[in-house]
Regions:
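Active-site neighborhoods and metal-handling regions in enzymes and metal-associated proteins
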Residues: 1-464
Length: 464
């Protein structure tokens, strides 16, 4: 596979003023509750306890459309019982966005410090657990953020990432033997409910990817030598939609090594490294590379980094598909890109995404996780080779079979047109021959600008 660079008309797109915050129909959430309770029944569990806070909201949000913002919340589910949601002072009013009937209980310990604590606060948990029928013979599945595996502890299935005071209170009722970590119900690569999306969820992620990629493109197009990181970050033109992570902008080699550094006062210089990462909720787009227009200075970088890195991305995109395992993708990349091991790639070459930026990854050499219909995936390979600039392309996509594609096209025709345009650009301009089931969410999907001061040049597969 020969790699070249081609000149294109600089990409330009209108800004979209549409919110990624969507509350679905009641039936959607109730169906999800039914599915997760079916998983609980198979495990012999009587109740599910789902915890959320500002950072770890996605599992609760999946069942309610609600996130607790700067407070905490606890959802309790059981067969044949109305769901019960424990909330802080400010969450009680906000939770009225939930579109179906459930019991909401004020638990002021989930509020911020210094706010009102009524005398009966001490009794709230006991009463709530009793209302939901939790008793010594109950078996509880606890869902926080992570599940654990044997490599992390001999008692991995009773390792919990919920606050200790909640776990302790439940343990007083059912003992430790009556509890199990079942966050895997949500994000296990093989069966987790949030690892595959329906047509409406895909539409949200496509919208988020569109808005995010256009912000990143706007950022790149406005860069000029001498601009500071914090000034340049304003080029993202962020609206009020919730973000998936803090925006990353830095212009120094040290900043690249730090990876997640927020923008500071460093100024952009020609021939320096430029790094940007940004995402609205359910999306992330990132670019790292050289800010230069003088390619003659960087023949070594072209030969030893840019060409093999882009070739690796082409292999990644052309290999993924429904039924392909993540292990197959990794093994093919390592087999065909001898530079892989010297690129300093410390994380999985790709991962799954939902409302949170990284739910789990199927891209591992140790397990055979098949890519499935409805999966939302981040193409995300971070290279940090010694003696060369960092390199990072990250964009999101989904896999959809013919039926799911037809449903999406019918229900979301404008989004489908954007996807079709991106697919054509990847195949015709970049030379990346993706499969029919690959639905790109980013307007700069696979676009590698080798010289970031000139966005009219992109890398491509040489068709000759």
């Amino acid at each position: 596979m020969n790699i070249t660079q081609v000149r294109i008309e600089p990409l330009q797109f209108e800004r979209l003023h549409e919110s990624v915050v969507k509350v679905f129909a009641p039936e959607t959430y109730l169906s999800r509750i039914e599915k997760v309770l079916a998983l609980a029944k198979k495990e012999g569990l009587t109740h599910l306890i789902i915890y959320a806070d500002r950072e770890h909201f996605a599992n609760l949000h999946y069942f309610t459309g609600f996130d607790p913002r700067f407070e905490e919340a606890l959802l309790i589910l059981a067969p044949d019982k109305k769901p019960l949601l424990l909330l802080g002072n400010e969450g009680v009013l906000y939770a009225t966005i939930i579109p179906y009937d459930l019991d909401m209980v004020l638990f002021q310990s989930f509020s911020l410090n210094g706010q009102q604590r009524d005398p009966e606060t001490i009794e709230v948990l006991d009463k709530a657990f009793n209302q939901m029928g939790i008793k010594p013979t109950s078996r509880l599945g606890l869902i926080g953020w992570k599940y654990f595996i044997p490599a992390e502890g001999k008692t991995y299935d009773t390792m919990f990432d919920l606050p200790h005071f909640l776990v302790e209170k439940l343990e007083q009722i059912v003992t430790l033997k009556g509890m199990k970590n079942v966050a895997s119900f949500m994000v296990d690569p093989s069966f987790g409910l949030r690892t595959t999306l329906d047509v409406d969820e895909i539409a949200v992620l496509e919208l988020a990817g569109t808005k995010t990629s256009r912000s990143v493109l706007n950022f790149l197009s406005k860069l000029k030598p001498g601009v500071s990181e914090i000034e340049a970050s304003s080029y993202l033109e962020i609206d009020g939609d919730p973000l998936i992570a803090h925006p990353v902008v830095n212009f120094t080699a040290e900043g690249i090594r730090q990876g997640l550094a927020s923008p500071g006062s460093h100024k952009l210089q020609l021939d320096s490294v430029c790094n940007v990462g940004f995402g609205y909720r359910s999306s992330m787009v990132a670019r790292t590379g050289l800010y230069t227009s003088d390619s003659a200075k960087f023949k070594k970088v072209w030969d030893e980094l840019l060409v093999p890195y882009f070739r690796m991305m082409v292999i990644w995109y052309e290999t993924i598909g429904i039924g392909v395992t993540g292990k197959t993708v990794v093994e093919r990349i390592k087999r065909e890109i001898p530079e892989f091991d010297s690129f300093g790639i410390g994380l999985n070459p790709g991962h799954l995404i939902h409302n949170d930026e990284w739910t789990t990854s199927v891209f591992t050499e140790t397990d055979d996780f098949p890519l499935r219909n409805g999966m939302a995936i981040q193409s995300d390979i971070i290279a940090a080779p010694v003696g060369l600039p960092g390199m990072h392309l990250e964009d999101g996509l989904a896999l959809a079979d013919s039926q799911l594609r037809a449903n999406f096209k019918e229900k979301y025709p404008e989004a489908w047109q954007r996807i079709e345009r991106r697919r054509n650009f990847m195949k015709e301009v970049l030379g990346i021959q993706i499969k029919d089931e690959v639905l790109p969410f980013s307007d700069i999907q696979g676009c590698m600008f080798p010289w970031m001061a000139d966005l009219g040049i992109v890398m491509a597969v040489d068709k000759k």
